[in-house]
Amino acid sequence: MTTTAAPKRKRWPIVTGLVVLSLVLLPMAFYTPDIPAATLRAKYTTPASTFMAVEPGLQVHVRDEGPRDAPVLMLIHGSNASLQTWEPWVKRLSDSFRIISLDLPGHGLTGASPTRDYSSAGYVRVVNEVAAAKGLTRFAIGGNSMGGGVAWRYAAAHPEQITGLILVDAAGAPSKTKSEPPLAFKLARMPYVRDVAIKFLPRSLIEKS
């Protein structure tokens, strides 16, 4: 006498449920809500910090450190960075120099540009407005990476103000031949990708960038 095995229970409902559960839990694991600006300001400002209204709707975070009668050095940070880049320099040099550093629009505590101008020319204009507001007529300027590109462009546009130029791995002049932007920049410009990345980009990926 032979017996037939009972049909195996269908596993598709279980598999489907696990997939749906993963799709729900995975975004929650990477969800990174914006930190309120007031919280960031309280954490990262120092007694040397001020917020300068250099343009309508734009308050630039500036630190002014060192003796007021010392030679002036203005430092410009790179892309996806902030004026904190220069804290080791400030610690070493602020006894002999008046060091002015700032967060460029879209970086650090300065926040977004109301005109969405993140071009090199726009950054040069902001640096010039900060210098004018501080009453600077002669100073050295330095920058690293993108900030180095801003620094040399500023020096080229205002040579009469510059006593020295410091470039640390600075961005160079644009190529005469048209080149495609990196894939990451292309993705960042796509509305839906940008909106998702703002909320779900893993912090570990930012820290490694």
Question: Which residues does each predicted region cover?
Answer:
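Alpha/beta-hydrolase fold catalytic core
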Residues: 2-71, 96-97, 136-137
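Conserved alpha/beta-hydrolase catalytic His-Asp/Glu region
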Residues: 29-35, 39-42, 176-182, 195-209
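Active-site loop/oxyanion-hole signature of alpha/beta-hydrolase fold enzymes
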Residues: 50-58, 63-65, 104-142
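Conserved HGGG/HGGXW glycine-rich cap/lid loop of the alpha/beta-hydrolase fold
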Residues: 58, 64-109
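Conserved catalytic-core motifs of eukaryotic protein kinase domains, centered on the activation segment
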Residues: 85-87, 110-116, 176-179
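Short, hydrophobic alpha-helix immediately C-terminal to the catalytic nucleophile
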Residues: 87, 128, 152-156
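Gly/Ala-rich beta-loop-alpha elbow adjacent to hydrolase catalytic centers
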Residues: 143, 147, 151
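Flexible "cap/lid" loop of the alpha/beta hydrolase fold
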Residues: 152-157, 163-195
